[in-house]
A protein has these predicted regions:
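Conserved class I S-adenosyl-L-methionine
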Residues: 14-23
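Conserved alpha-helix/loop element of class I SAM-dependent methyltransferases that forms part
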Residues: 1-15, 30
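Conserved SAM-binding motif I beta-strand of class I
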Residues: 38-43
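A short acidic, Gly/Pro-enriched loop at the edge of an enzyme's catalytic core
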Residues: 78-89
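A short helix->loop->beta-strand "cap" motif at the edges of active sites that frequently abuts
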Residues: 36-37, 117
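S-adenosyl-L-methionine-dependent methyltransferase catalytic module, highlighting the catalytic core
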Residues: 1, 5, 26, 48-66, ...
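A short beta-strand submotif of the Rossmann-like class I SAM-dependent methyltransferase core
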Residues: 92-95
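Conserved SAM-binding loop of SAM-dependent methyltransferases across substrates and taxa
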Residues: 24-35
Length: 180
């Protein structure tokens, strides 16, 4: 499910978009469909990067893209292999709840984002996540699983501590299926 509203973000030709924790590439593919955009997906999981690559290649074969280019990178959000002020848009969807040092990750994300440009961050909603944690210890004790539950106000405060200004809050879905 693509949860980023690209039409609200004024993505322009020539933009460079980073999708951190891209998984199978849902947002990378959506960015690639914008006109003349460079869409970069980054993830630690090689299997997910391979799947994202296959999806992007399918977009190429079907000419289902905006004429730009795409790339993939094996990358850790706490130590991104990109230069400062490199991206016009950074997406970090459903990632920060997995990161022990999430403030280090936020600092890195802000470092690679051009000043004044858009950052899209999503995390699971507080109460559905709290319920999943209560249902099973396995839910939050699985390696690579969720290590924290964010309250909206805390996440906004963490981002603002690194100079990010909130201009919108959007709720794409309120419930999710617990996986473990």
């Amino acid at each position: 499910m693509v949860t980023v509203k690209f039409d609200r973000l004024a993505v322009k030709p020539g933009f460079k978009v980073l999708d951190i924790g891209c998984g199978s590439g849902r947002h990378t593919c959506a960015a690639y469909q914008c006109r003349n955009v460079t869409a970069i997906g980054a993830d630690l999981n090689f299997k997910d990067l391979t799947e994202a690559g296959e999806r992007l290649k399918l977009h190429d074969r079907l000419c289902a893209h905006g004429g730009g280019v795409w790339g993939l990178s094996a990358a850790d959000v706490t130590c991104l292999p990109f230069k400062d002020d490199d991206f016009d848009l950074v997406i970090c969807s459903e990632v920060l709840e997995h990161i022990v040092e999430h403030q280090v990750a936020i600092e890195e994300i802000v470092r690679v984002l051009k000043p004044g440009c858009n950052l899209v961050v999503s995390v699971p909603r507080y109460w559905p996540e709290r319920i999943c944690w209560a249902l099973s210890q396995d839910y939050h004790n699985t390696p690579g699983g969720h290590v924290r539950i964010f309250k909206k106000s805390d996440l906004i405060a963490d981002l603002e501590n690194y100079g990010v200004e909130k201009w919108a809050v959007h709720f794409a879905h309120s419930l999710h299926t617990p996986f473990w």
